Design a protein with these regions (language model features):
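Short, Lys/Arg-rich, polar N-terminal cytosolic tail immediately upstream
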Residues: 1-10
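Alpha-helical transmembrane segments of integral membrane proteins
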Residues: 10, 14, 40-48, 80-84, ...
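The first (N-terminal) embedded transmembrane alpha-helix
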Residues: 13-33
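Hydrophobic core of alpha-helical transmembrane segments in multi-pass integral membrane proteins
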Residues: 25-28, 46-59, 81-93, 151-154, ...
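Helix-coil boundary and interhelical linker segments in multi-pass alpha-helical membrane proteins
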Residues: 27-44, 90-103, 138-147, 183-186
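Loop-to-helix transition at the N-terminal end of transmembrane alpha-helices
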Residues: 37-53, 71-75, 175-176
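Juxtamembrane helix-capping/reentrant segments at transmembrane boundaries
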Residues: 66-83
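Membrane-embedded catalytic cores of phosphoryl/pyrophosphoryl-handling enzymes
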Residues: 101-186
């Protein structure tokens, strides 16, 4: 594959498997399987959560404070983690502790908090963490969707490395953290 095509494919994979997309798909699957009546409430909460984070990211990039929407430089990440954690806590409160989704939201929030704490030493791939989390968390709900998510990890890992967003330890570390956090939802 020529370099231009490889870069285009890597970028497409990175966008298609972005944490927003992955977490939205997992949340919709979990809601459909566990609490269909909550679907309108969950969709509204999810839309607000993604919207708030996306507006924040867009503002950082458009102002020139960040180079990419991925917050690829380690110094860009602490504020991103803070905003995302506030949004996750808000979503958790919106859904309610009694919601069947509460454990998953708490596990995802814990995963992001750990990644944020570790950011001082390693910039874990949130793309990899999100997809590994989704694969592990989806497994009990739909084994074939869980397996499909996990099967996409090598392609996403290649994408993140090819785009030079991460080094191997960051890709592997994000994957391990995500898988462990996803298993905590069982």
């Amino acid at each position: 594959m020529n370099p231009v095509a490889a870069h285009g494919l890597a970028r497409t994979v990175s966008i298609a498997l972005h944490p927003f997309v992955v977490f939205a798909a997992l949340t919709l699957l979990a809601t459909w399987m566990l609490d269909r009546e909550a679907l309108p409430r969950v969709v509204a909460g999810l839309a607000v959560a993604i919207g708030v984070v996306w507006v924040f990211v867009w503002q950082r990039v458009s102002s020139g404070r960040w180079g990419t929407v991925d917050a690829s430089r380690p110094h860009e990440r602490p504020l991103l983690y803070a905003v995302v954690l506030v949004v996750v806590v808000g979503l958790w409160a919106w859904l309610g502790m009694a919601s069947p989704l509460a454990r998953g939201v708490a596990a995802a929030g814990t995963m992001l908090a750990l990644a944020g704490l570790l950011n001082r030493w390693i910039k874990l791939s949130l793309h990899m963490a999100s997809l590994a989390f989704a694969g592990a968390a989806a497994w009990p709900l739909s084994p074939w969707l869980g397996a499909a998510s996990l099967a996409l990890l090598p392609l996403l890992g290649w994408s993140r490395l090819h785009l030079r967003r991460h080094a191997w330890p960051e890709v592997v570390g994000g994957t391990v953290l995500g898988a462990l956090a996803g298993m905590a939802t069982w």
